[in-house]
C-alpha cells in the first residue's frame, strides 16, 4: 500500500501544471465594398475607409449623416511621414447634401480623396447621437482577452504503523542449581491507518507494566 501511495503522489506531482496567461489582441477596421459599373459591366473591390459623421438637430429632429471615404496609398504615405515637405496636394471629390426642413435649407459638403475607382457613399440614418464630428477620423479599438486555466490537484496519503511488544519472562529452577530466562515475542501485531498512534502507545504501556509485575514477584 505504501508503494501504491508513493506512485499516486508522484503521478499527481507530474500531472500538475502551472497556470498560463495568454493575451489575444483583436484589431477592428472598417472596410467598404465599392462597385463600379461601366458599359454594362460591374467590378467590385474592397478597400479600408474612414468614417465621417455629421449630426444636425432641427426642431427636435436629429439627423445623422455618415460618409465613408476609402483610403488610398497616398493617404497612408502622408500619415506615416511627419515632415511637412512630404505633404503634397491630392485631388478630391466634393459631395454636397442639401436638406430642407420647415423652410430651413441646410447644405453638407464632404471632400474625399480621389483614387482610381473610389467613390464616396453617403448613408442618411435618423437617430440620436451624443456628439458632432465634422472631420474624418480613423478609429482602432483593442480587445484584450485573458484566459487562465485552473489546475486542481488532490493528494491523499495513507499512514500505516506497525507495533510489536516483546515479553521477557524469568523463572527459577526447582533444584535451585540454575536459573534460565526465555524471550517470548507476543503475536500481537496491530496495523493503524491515519492517526491511530494512541492505541500503539497503550499496548506498549501494558507490556512494560507486565514486565514490572513479574520483576516484583521474583524479588
From Swiss-Prot:
Q: Which residues form the propeptide?
A: 195-219
Glycosylation positions in this chain: 21, 173, 188
Q: Where in the cell is it found?
A: Secreted, Cell wall; Membrane
Q: PTM per UniProt?
A: The GPI-anchor is attached to the protein in the endoplasmic reticulum and serves to target the protein to the cell surface. There, the glucosamine-inositol phospholipid moiety is cleaved off and the GPI-modified mannoprotein is covalently attached via its lipidless GPI glycan remnant to the 1,6-beta-glucan of the outer cell wall layer.
UniProt membrane topology term:
Lipid-anchor; GPI-anchor
The keyword Signal appears for this protein? yes
Please report which positions carry a covalently bound lipid of kind GPI-anchor amidated glycine.
Answer: 194
UniProt signal peptide: 1-19
Entries under InterPro entries matching the protein: Flocculin_t3_rpt (IPR025928)
Q: What is its main location?
A: secreted
UniProt KW keywords: Cell wall, Glycoprotein, GPI-anchor, Lipoprotein, Membrane, Repeat, Secreted, Signal
Upregulating conditions: Up-regulated by high iron, during biofilm development, and upon ALS2 depletion.
This protein's GO CC annotations: extracellular region; fungal-type cell wall; side of membrane
State if Membrane is listed as a keyword: yes
Q: Could you tell me what this protein does?
A: Probable cell wall protein that participates directly in adhesive cell-cell interactions.
Cite any additional comment in the entry: The PGA6 mRNA is transported by SHE3 to the hyphal tips during filamentous growth.
Q: Which family does it belong to?
A: Belongs to the flocculin family.
For this entry, the protein name equals Predicted GPI-anchored protein 6
User: Gene behind this chain?
Assistant: PGA6
Amino acid at each position: 500500500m505504501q508503494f501504491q501511495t508513493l506512485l499516486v503522489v508522484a503521478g499527481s506531482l507530474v500531472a500538475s501544471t502551472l497556470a498560463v496567461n495568454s493575451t489575444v489582441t483583436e484589431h477592428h477596421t472598417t472596410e467598404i465594398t465599392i462597385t463600379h459599373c461601366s458599359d454594362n459591366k460591374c467590378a467590385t473591390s474592397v478597400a479600408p475607409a474612414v468614417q465621417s459623421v455629421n449630426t444636425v438637430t432641427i426642431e427636435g429632429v436629429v439627423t445623422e449623416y455618415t460618409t465613408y471615404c476609402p483610403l488610398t496609398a497616398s493617404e497612408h504615405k502622408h500619415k506615416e511621414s511627419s515632415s511637412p515637405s512630404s505633404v503634397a496636394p491630392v485631388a478630391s471629390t466634393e459631395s454636397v447634401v442639401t436638406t430642407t426642413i420647415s423652410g430651413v435649407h441646410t447644405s453638407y459638403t464632404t471632400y474625399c480623396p480621389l483614387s482610381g475607382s473610389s467613390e464616396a457613399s453617403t448613408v442618411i440614418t435618423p437617430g440620436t447621437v451624443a456628439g458632432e464630428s465634422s472631420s474624418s477620423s480613423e478609429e482602432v479599438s483593442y480587445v484584450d482577452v485573458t484566459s487562465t486555466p485552473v489546475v486542481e490537484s488532490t493528494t491523499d496519503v495513507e499512514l500505516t504503523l506497525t507495533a510489536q511488544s516483546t515479553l521477557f519472562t524469568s523463572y527459577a529452577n526447582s533444584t535451585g542449581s540454575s536459573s534460565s530466562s526465555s524471550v517470548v515475542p507476543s503475536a500481537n501485531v496491530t496495523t493503524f491507518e491515519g492517526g491511530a498512534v494512541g492505541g500503539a502507545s497503550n499496548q506498549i504501556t501494558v507490556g512494560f507494566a507486565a514486565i514490572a509485575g513479574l520483576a516484583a514477584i521474583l524479588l
